[in-house]
A protein has these predicted regions:
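Membrane-interfacial loop-to-transmembrane alpha-helix junctions, especially the N-terminal start
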Residues: 10-12, 49-63, 102-115, 161-169
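Alpha-helical transmembrane segments of multi-pass inner-membrane proteins
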Residues: 147-148, 161-190, 204-218
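N-terminal signal-anchor transmembrane segment
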Residues: 2-98, 120-125
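Juxtamembrane membrane-water interface segments that cap and precede transmembrane helices
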Residues: 14-20, 72-73, 188-202
Length: 218
């Protein structure tokens, strides 16, 4: 599936697919999990074959798409299927680990220094013990950044590859937009107030939804 999106010369193919995905998720939330599984399994061969340089850029495409799609996963409550709440961070983490171990992408030693500086925070939590969920919620993001720095430092991409990368970030935003548009009630039914209004964000946090829609608009 990732291969089809990358090699398609007509961007309307990916746009319409993700509009349909957003609409479908408003009817049956389980559609997202089906899409997640189909996309993951059909993309596995694409990101694990070819030369080292080809695999590197394909993994970058995969990480960009999946990390952006993590918001729709939360909105559709994919955690009911044991998909981790922070699965976007897991994708970045394991994607970077794969590149470091399998492709020997180890040029950003600054990331290694950052990781070692984060280690004390895994064991010392001030006035309480550090639990696993504390590490995942607070540290998995920075740790993923550390390993991404190690894996992606000095990676050169062409203008065409950069455009493809932007498409991979944009497609999930289109699905979120479609989902929010359908879920938003008529203005007459909205109770406007000073705080965040979940009725206009598909029932999810306004910060996250506005962020990904802002990225898509930009």
């Amino acid at each position: 599936m990732l291969k089809a999106f990358i090699r398609s010369k007509n961007p309307m193919f990916g746009i319409l697919m993700h509009v349909a995905l957003g609409f479908a998720c408003t009817v049956v939330r389980d559609v997202f999990m089906l899409w997640f599984l189909v996309f993951s399994f059909t993309s596995f061969g694409f990101i694990t074959t070819g030369s080292k340089k080809v695999k590197l850029i394909n993994v970058i495409y995969f990480i960009s798409y999946m990390s952006s799609m993590s918001l729709l996963a939360r909105m559709t409550k994919a955690y009911n299927y044991k998909l981790p709440w922070e699965f976007g961070k897991y994708v970045i983490f394991f994607g970077a680990i794969y590149l470091i171990l399998a492709l020997n992408a180890r040029r950003g030693l600054l990331g290694l220094l950052m990781f070692f500086l984060l280690i004390p925070a895994m064991f010392f939590g001030g006035d309480r013990d550090v639990q696993w969920h504390d590490i995942v919620f607070n540290l998995l993001g920075p740790i993923s950044v550390c390993f991404a720095i190690i894996a992606f430092t000095k990676t050169n991409i062409t203008k065409q590859q950069f455009r493809q990368l932007l498409k991979m970030v944009l497609y999930p935003a289109i699905s979120v937009l479609a989902y929010v548009v359908i879920k938003t009630p008529d203005f007459d039914e909205i109770n406007f107030q000073l705080g965040a209004n979940f009725s206009t964000t598909g029932g999810y946090g306004s910060n996250q939804v506005s962020t990904i829609l802002g990225v898509g608009l930009f």
